[in-house]
A protein has these predicted regions:
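Extracytosolic ligand-binding ectodomains
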Residues: 1-104
């Protein structure tokens, strides 16, 4: 999952740079990060999500089961979705993290 996370992060960063402009992004990394937190995320690896104040990427979490060979209906039909956990419930609450960058 490391590669998928890197793909998601870089794609979102490039979208934020395009939004603020290359010159502004080079001048202020803080402005770029603020834009990344303000913009919703959306990519093929994790789908829609957000970045909260402490920098954690929030997205739904999925529980899949591998199908038996006879249940598969063709190529790449290997998994059955059992449960989806909303992004707000899938990660530790912001207040429980103790991040010094987040001021209550």
């Amino acid at each position: 999952m490391i590669q998928a996370g890197e793909y998601s992060a870089v794609l979102h960063y490039l979208k934020a740079v395009a939004d603020v402009g290359v010159r502004a992004a080079k001048a202020s990394g803080a402005e770029t990060v603020a834009r990344m937190k303000a913009m919703p995320t959306d990519d093929d690896a994790f789908g829609p999500g957000t970045i909260r104040a402490d920098g954690r990427k929030l997205h739904p979490a999925y529980l899949f089961e591998v199908k038996k060979p006879e249940e598969s209906r063709g190529p790449f039909n290997y998994y059955r979705l059992l449960q989806t956990t909303d992004a707000a419930d899938a990660f530790r609450p912001l207040g429980d993290g103790g991040c010094p960058l987040v001021r209550a």
